[in-house]
């Protein structure tokens, strides 16, 4: 036997290297085979519900790192709630209708207009489902736990029927209407868009300054006067029917020396406009308030059949332009509102493809709207005063990335204005985890217009509306419920398979159809109505869920998307928000803080992270950032997180190894019988438990990460485990001191493994497989630990807080001695302490081997004043010298009692007593050489 064999060196097969990329799929299959999600649900049956409702990602392509952050966050919440006394089911969902899938099929060579519509929709459905299953596998690879066999998908018959019923209730309440209002129109998609389907980019446009000649000045202006207008959309002049001024803005009538004409502009802008137009010696002839110019009539710049009326509008400013805007009610929301109020014609001169129509005039007909500037300039002639290129923020179709226009077309709307206050009141009852989130959603609802819910596409849920022979729209409770029942059985494709009369209830009649003939609507619903109905299709329709949901968690872009549409439909139907809480997240940026883009080559695919690091590192990264704001991610950042993971793993490996001979049923030492330092560590750990439990409850992942890493680095590695080897390796295997420390080790190991499970389930299960005395076969089936409190807890904490200050001072003294070459490592030191009464009382209260805690070989507490050469602090001073004696081959301390024993061992008296008591046979035979 060798002397080293008398040490209690920790033993474990738990590997230092995790091998996550290869091991994670094996564990995930094991969980699936063991039906862990179902078993967890059975354990939680009857407990209070916590329902996090999954906002459905769009089923197209593999998931990106933003998806990963969002879904890992959801998984952490679901797992922590499931382990905290809640019935927390997770039903993953997918959004499957809409233009992107039509675009994919078009790229694959599918020609929608040349094939049977039902066959085309079948192809859309097949592709969408293939993408659902692809993304499902992507999410499962992240280690997510959920009901993967009972997904919700917006194309299933039950979901489509539920969506129709949401629409039906809104129709019954009078919230659905048809109108020809300007809407965001995407010529590239040939469809109307909702606000949630646009994004803003900088666009360079040609802006024109031109003049309308006064035709009837109403006794205010002469007919040789021209009103100066500014536009950034020259094509809309073809549909201009008025000029709008601000009622309280001052306007001036001016005569430039170089002009025979007189002009009207905003007084505030005269100087800048004079410079722009090259006007010199400008004479101000008169000043008018905008309201004085109301109802003056001007000529259209070139269309002699059209007069343009001066009207008042609150949207006019003097921030730019001339303070006067031309008004084309068919091409803008503000234009429409003031135009209708003043009886202006709503002219639309651009078709659905962005092509100018005949009513724009023969010179324009057939041109693309954005290419007509030269023709407009030619038509304006000397009415054009200036032109310039400007860069401004402009709306684009978020799917095709092409600019859009406002265009008045007949559409179906949901009237938000009819129940806006009800929605705002519902927002006040929701808990927002960021105050700005509440303000953002509130302002969006307060300021938004009515919702355009119709789309001129094929792949989607049909609007369940019929038309009588006289054109009357039919959407009664009876007809809509009948359609819902048909969809429930056959799916929405039946709408296209049957004639209108075969989709109506048997025997249905309508006074507008004396011949019994009907037509059906060919528009489909906005996809935001699809996902915005999920509270009904999922929360209401599934018996194991609750409505409203406890939490919606999505990216901050969903304040104008899913949060918004779900809120509108839920309040319209039931008067309540579909969620009790909203938690939003920022976007994922690259390591430099730049937006990720395939064209820039700075994206990170979750699959690449899984191959290089493992999903566990991605999960840990999610907790290491404040995801309520935009966050950075790169392979370098993940490499740093991987180092943190390695530290966590190897710390827990040390605990596993050094409790391998510990049986908690037999070897646990009661708290009251622990040493003071062990009590301190037990209390500190329970403070960590409380911090983490509270942070899980508040979804504060970064708090968990910081607290956990700090505890492992500072409390364990830099202190408790730093001197632990002196006890667990050297003392007798069954000694009280060793069992005291092992009691703390084991308690921390078991509980920290449970606390880690929501974040690092793979690693937690791997650790759990080494804890043979724990009852549950999987840690995921256990409960999160409760924080304990102990008698005299504050007193113990105060004592050890003071000791940590003392320890820091001692380490400074040791460092000075090391720099002076008095010692090398701290175990070579004999530390003499010169304490005042406060420190002396402290060291007595610590009631531990202080030399062991400071990792020095010898320590003396001296009486009297410290020598001049001492390292002094306010309450204590230290001197350091090399310890007397020689190194013990067993404990490595320098000790005056170290000597060669008769059994061929050079060890100190303390080690000799342990060896002689526990290894009598080896002592009798003598130890082998090293």
Curated annotation (Swiss-Prot):
<dbReference type="GO" id="GO:0004822">
    <property type="term" value="F:isoleucine-tRNA ligase activity"/>
</dbReference>
<feature type="binding site">
    <location>
        <position position="911"/>
    </location>
    <ligand>
        <name>Zn(2+)</name>
    </ligand>
</feature>
<dbReference type="InterPro" id="IPR009080">
    <property type="entry name" value="tRNAsynth_Ia_anticodon-bd"/>
</dbReference>
<dbReference type="InterPro" id="IPR014729">
    <property type="entry name" value="Rossmann-like_a/b/a_fold"/>
</dbReference>
<comment type="subunit">
    <text>Monomer.</text>
</comment>
<dbReference type="InterPro" id="IPR002300">
    <property type="entry name" value="aa-tRNA-synth_Ia"/>
</dbReference>
<dbReference type="Pfam" id="PF08264">
    <property type="entry name" value="Anticodon_1"/>
</dbReference>
<dbReference type="InterPro" id="IPR009008">
    <property type="entry name" value="Val/Leu/Ile-tRNA-synth_edit"/>
</dbReference>
<feature type="binding site">
    <location>
        <position position="888"/>
    </location>
    <ligand>
        <name>Zn(2+)</name>
    </ligand>
</feature>
<keyword id="KW-0547">Nucleotide-binding</keyword>
<keyword id="KW-0067">ATP-binding</keyword>
<dbReference type="InterPro" id="IPR050081">
    <property type="entry name" value="Ile-tRNA_ligase"/>
</dbReference>
<comment type="function">
    <text>Catalyzes the attachment of isoleucine to tRNA(Ile). As IleRS can inadvertently accommodate and process structurally similar amino acids such as valine, to avoid such errors it has two additional distinct tRNA(Ile)-dependent editing activities. One activity is designated as 'pretransfer' editing and involves the hydrolysis of activated Val-AMP. The other activity is designated 'posttransfer' editing and involves deacylation of mischarged Val-tRNA(Ile).</text>
</comment>
<dbReference type="InterPro" id="IPR033708">
    <property type="entry name" value="Anticodon_Ile_BEm"/>
</dbReference>
<feature type="binding site">
    <location>
        <position position="891"/>
    </location>
    <ligand>
        <name>Zn(2+)</name>
    </ligand>
</feature>
<keyword id="KW-0862">Zinc</keyword>
<dbReference type="InterPro" id="IPR010663">
    <property type="entry name" value="Znf_FPG/IleRS"/>
</dbReference>
<dbReference type="Pfam" id="PF06827">
    <property type="entry name" value="zf-FPG_IleRS"/>
</dbReference>
<feature type="binding site">
    <location>
        <position position="554"/>
    </location>
    <ligand>
        <name>L-isoleucyl-5'-AMP</name>
    </ligand>
</feature>
<dbReference type="GO" id="GO:0006428">
    <property type="term" value="P:isoleucyl-tRNA aminoacylation"/>
</dbReference>
<dbReference type="GO" id="GO:0002161">
    <property type="term" value="F:aminoacyl-tRNA deacylase activity"/>
</dbReference>
<keyword id="KW-0963">Cytoplasm</keyword>
<feature type="short sequence motif" description="'KMSKS' region">
    <location>
        <begin position="595"/>
        <end position="599"/>
    </location>
</feature>
<dbReference type="Pfam" id="PF00133">
    <property type="entry name" value="tRNA-synt_1"/>
</dbReference>
<keyword id="KW-0479">Metal-binding</keyword>
<dbReference type="InterPro" id="IPR013155">
    <property type="entry name" value="M/V/L/I-tRNA-synth_anticd-bd"/>
</dbReference>
<feature type="binding site">
    <location>
        <position position="598"/>
    </location>
    <ligand>
        <name>ATP</name>
    </ligand>
</feature>
<dbReference type="GO" id="GO:0008270">
    <property type="term" value="F:zinc ion binding"/>
</dbReference>
<dbReference type="GO" id="GO:0000049">
    <property type="term" value="F:tRNA binding"/>
</dbReference>
<dbReference type="InterPro" id="IPR023585">
    <property type="entry name" value="Ile-tRNA-ligase_type1"/>
</dbReference>
<protein>
    <recommendedName>
        <fullName>Isoleucine--tRNA ligase</fullName>
        <ecNumber>6.1.1.5</ecNumber>
    </recommendedName>
</protein>
<keyword id="KW-0648">Protein biosynthesis</keyword>
<dbReference type="GO" id="GO:0005524">
    <property type="term" value="F:ATP binding"/>
</dbReference>
<feature type="short sequence motif" description="'HIGH' region">
    <location>
        <begin position="57"/>
        <end position="67"/>
    </location>
</feature>
<dbReference type="InterPro" id="IPR002301">
    <property type="entry name" value="Ile-tRNA-ligase"/>
</dbReference>
<comment type="similarity">
    <text>Belongs to the class-I aminoacyl-tRNA synthetase family. IleS type 1 subfamily.</text>
</comment>
<keyword id="KW-0436">Ligase</keyword>
<keyword id="KW-0030">Aminoacyl-tRNA synthetase</keyword>
<feature type="binding site">
    <location>
        <position position="908"/>
    </location>
    <ligand>
        <name>Zn(2+)</name>
    </ligand>
</feature>
<dbReference type="InterPro" id="IPR001412">
    <property type="entry name" value="aa-tRNA-synth_I_CS"/>
</dbReference>
<dbReference type="GO" id="GO:0005829">
    <property type="term" value="C:cytosol"/>
</dbReference>
């Amino acid at each position: 036997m060798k002397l080293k064999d008398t040490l209690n060196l920790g033993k474990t097969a738990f590997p230092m290297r995790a091998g996550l990329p290869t091991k994670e799929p094996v564990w995930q299959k094991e969980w699936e085979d063991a039906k862990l999600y179902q078993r967890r649900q059975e354990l939680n049956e009857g407990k209070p519900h916590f329902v996090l409702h999954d906002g459905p990602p769009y089923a197209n392509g593999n998931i990106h790192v933003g998806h990963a952050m969002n879904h890992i966050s959801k998984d952490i919440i679901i797992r922590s709630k499931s382990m905290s006394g809640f019935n927390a089911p997770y039903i993953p969902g997918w959004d499957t209708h809409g233009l992107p899938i039509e675009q994919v099929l078009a790229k694959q060579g599918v020609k929608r207009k040349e094939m049977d519509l039902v066959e085309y929709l079948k192809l859309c459905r097949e592709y969408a489902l293939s993408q659902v299953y692809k993304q499902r596998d992507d999410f499962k690879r992240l280690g997510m736990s959920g009901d993967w066999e009972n997904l919700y998908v917006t194309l299933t018959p039950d979901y489509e029927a539920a969506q129709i019923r949401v629409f039906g209730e809104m129709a019954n309440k009078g919230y659905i209407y048809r109108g020809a209002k300007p809407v965001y129109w995407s010529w590239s998609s040939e469809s109307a868009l909702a606000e949630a389907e646009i994004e803003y980019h900088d666009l360079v446009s040609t802006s024109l300054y031109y003049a309308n000649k006064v035709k009837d000045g109403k006794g205010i202006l002469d007919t040789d006067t021209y009103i100066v207008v500014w536009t950034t959309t020259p094509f809309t002049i073809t549909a201009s029917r008025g000029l709008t001024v601000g009622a309280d803005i001052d306007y001036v009538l001016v005569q430039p020396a170089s002009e025979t004409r007189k002009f009207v502009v905003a007084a505030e802008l005269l100087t800048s406009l004079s410079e722009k137009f090259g006007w010199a010696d400008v004479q101000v002839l008169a000043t008018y308030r905008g309201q004085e110019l109301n109802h003056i009539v001007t000529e259209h710049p070139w269309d002699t059949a059209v007069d343009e009326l001066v009207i008042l509008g609150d949207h006019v400013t003097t921030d730019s332009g001339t303070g006067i805007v031309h008004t084309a009610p068919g091409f803008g929301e503000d234009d429409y509102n003031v135009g209708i109020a003043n009886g202006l014609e709503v002219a639309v001169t651009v078709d659905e493809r962005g092509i100018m129509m005949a009513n724009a005039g023969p010179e324009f007909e057939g041109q693309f709207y954005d290419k007509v500037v030269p023709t407009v300039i030619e038509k304006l002639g000397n009415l054009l005063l200036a032109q310039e290129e400007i860069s401004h923020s402009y709306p684009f179709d978020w799917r095709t990335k092409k600019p859009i226009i406002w265009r008045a077309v007949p559409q179906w709307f949901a009237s938000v204005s009819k129940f806006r206050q009800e929605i705002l009141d519902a927002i006040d009852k929701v808990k927002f985890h960021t105050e700005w989130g509440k303000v953002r959603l509130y302002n969006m609802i307060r300021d938004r217009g009515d919702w355009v819910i119709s789309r001129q596409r094929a792949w989607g849920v049909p609007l369940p509306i019929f038309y009588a022979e006289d054109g009357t729209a039919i959407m009664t409770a009876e007809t809509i419920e009948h359609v819902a029942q048909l969809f429930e059985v056959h799916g929405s494709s039946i709408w296209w398979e049957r004639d209108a009369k075969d989709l109506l209830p048997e025997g249905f009649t309508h006074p507008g159809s004396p011949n019994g003939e009907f037509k059906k609507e060919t528009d489909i619903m906005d996809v935001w109505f699809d996902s915005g109905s999920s509270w009904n299709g999922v929360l209401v329709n599934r018996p194991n869920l609750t409505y409203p949901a406890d939490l919606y968690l999505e990216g901050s872009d969903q304040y104008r998307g899913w949060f918004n549409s779900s809120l509108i439909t839920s309040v319209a139907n039931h008067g309540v928000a579909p969620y009790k809480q909203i938690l939003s997240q920022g976007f994922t940026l690259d390591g430099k803080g730049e937006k990720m883009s395939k064209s820039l080559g700075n994206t990170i695919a979750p699959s690449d992270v899984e191959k290089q690091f493992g999903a566990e590192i991605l999960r840990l990264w999610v907790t290491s950032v404040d995801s309520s704001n935009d966050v950075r991610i790169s392979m370098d950042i993940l490499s740093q997180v991987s180092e943190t993971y390695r530290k966590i793993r190897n710390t827990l490996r040390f605990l596993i190894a050094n409790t391998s001979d510990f049986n908690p049923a037999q070897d646990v030492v009661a708290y009251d019988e622990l040493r003071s330092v062990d009590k301190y560590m037990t209390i500190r750990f329970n403070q960590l438990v409380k911090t983490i439990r509270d942070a899980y409850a508040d979804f504060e992942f970064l708090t968990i990460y910081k607290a956990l890493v700090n505890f492992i680095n500072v409390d364990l590695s830099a202190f408790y485990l730093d001197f632990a080897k002196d006890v667990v390796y050297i003392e007798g295997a069954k000694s009280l001191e060793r069992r005291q420390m092992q009691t703390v080790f084991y308690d921390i190991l078991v509980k920290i493994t449970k606390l880690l499970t929501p974040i690092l389930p793979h690693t937690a299960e791997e650790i759990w497989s080494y804890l043979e005395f724990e009852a549950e076969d999987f840690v995921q089936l256990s409960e999160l630990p409760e924080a304990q409190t102990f008698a005299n807890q504050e007193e113990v904490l105060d004592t050890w807080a003071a000791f940590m200050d003392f320890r820091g001072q001692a380490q400074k003294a040791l460092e000075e001695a090391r720099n002076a070459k008095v010692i090398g490592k701290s175990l070579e030191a004999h530390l003499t302490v010169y304490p005042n009464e406060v420190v002396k009382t402290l060291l007595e209260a610590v009631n531990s081997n202080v030399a062991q805690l400071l990792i020095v070989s010898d320590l003396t507490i001296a009486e009297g004043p410290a020598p001049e050469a001492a390292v002094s602090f306010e309450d204590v001073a230290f001197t350091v010298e090399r310890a007397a004696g020689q190194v013990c081959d067993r404990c490595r301390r320098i000790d005056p009692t170290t000597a060669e024993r008769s059994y061929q061992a050079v060890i100190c008296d303390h080690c000799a007593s342990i060896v002689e008591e526990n290894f009598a046979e080896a002592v009798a035979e003598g130890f082998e050489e090293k």
